[in-house]
Amino acid sequence: MSGAPVDVPNPHQEEDDDDEEMPRVQMTRRRFVLGLGLIFAVVALLYYGLPRIAGIDETWHRIEQGDPWWLALALVFTVLSFGGYVVLFRYVYVEGGARIGMRESYEVTMASLAATRIFAAGGAGGIALTAWVMRRAGMSRRAVVDRTIVFLVLTYVVYMVGMLVVGVGLRTGVFPGPAPFGLTVVPAAFAGIAIMIALLIALLPTDLQRRVDEAIGRGGWLARLAAKAATLPASMSAGVRHSIDHVRARDPAILGSIGYWAFNIAVLWASFRAFGEAPPWAVLVMGFLVGMLGNLLPLPGGVGGVDGGMIGAFIGFGVDDGLAVVAVLTYRAFAFWLPTIPGAVAFFQLRRTVARWREERDHGRRTTAMARAGA
């Protein structure tokens, strides 16, 4: 297992957690229903409004001609992809989170994915929900921050390494396929810089806040400001180091991350095969990875950023534009929109799970109080 320190739940901490409410900005019941309404409105626009735009009606109707066997395989790959995501979550957060089993891991991951898809760019909605649940599970704030960083690093290190290796491989001719500069060298350089920054962050001492306190002293507003400023770099350094420990220990979390991305790409491959020939595997991977950068755009529900980016990337690689459109939209239907439904269900299941935790905790406190009173 990783070298992350085990965080022992604190009973006083759990009392504080009872006062914490579910993140309201992202995940109130009303906003969740409105978000689902937005999804259905967007789907209706895509499937009923988009075909009426001049010039793409013929391309759109190709969806009706998709091979059902390949589409069924895409569905299987979708399930396997999110299975990998659940495994990744489970093995990152299990230490110090005694209440987190596979069922709870499923509820948290699917609900957070739904929150990310509906409400926020870059995964902010899912991160807020996950942090709230982990606090209710008995983890300290620092442990939640550290493990969230580990989770994000392990998720995106596979993404960045893939972009670097495949981008360089295509450009140098090691991998077969066209290699336009802007779709190989530029994203590979971006990935390389991101990896270098992460490794440099790992060099920072994890007790940076304590060192700042000792160097400046604990008095005055300047010392307090410096100590707070040192908290985030120290947490990031600890998170990156713990991620490296997971890799060295060959933790199942790594397999979960690889499975998540690999099966996601497999969904896209099956979507291409449902309507024609898939591009060379390296082009398929690079087009997928470049398109996923659209997740960083602050668009409602993430609509348009990934879709447009992925379609544009494949067209830039020379893939037939009609095939690229139907394949990418089919992929998004499976990997993005379809899981939102079980994610919404998992969200309400998660609320019941957290309520059960509170009841169990309250029962334990009453039992302890009665035992002390009878002693």
Show the residue positions of the predicted features.
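Predominantly cytoplasmic-facing regulatory/coupling regions of multi-pass membrane proteins
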Residues: 1-110, 169, 174-292, 336-375
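Hydrophobic/aromatic residues within the transmembrane alpha-helices of Major Facilitator Superfamily
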Residues: 79-80, 118-122, 157, 258, ...
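Re-entrant/interfacial helical elements at transmembrane boundaries that shape
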Residues: 91, 123-137, 165, 300-316
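Transmembrane helix-loop junction
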Residues: 94-95, 117, 136, 273-274, ...
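Membrane-interface alpha-helices at helix entry/exit sites of multi-pass transporters
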Residues: 103-107, 122-127, 136-153, 318-330
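Membrane-embedded alpha-helical segments of transport systems
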Residues: 111, 115-119, 143-164, 190-193, ...
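Transmembrane alpha-helix interface/packing and boundary motifs in multi-pass membrane proteins
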Residues: 111-121, 272-274, 286-307
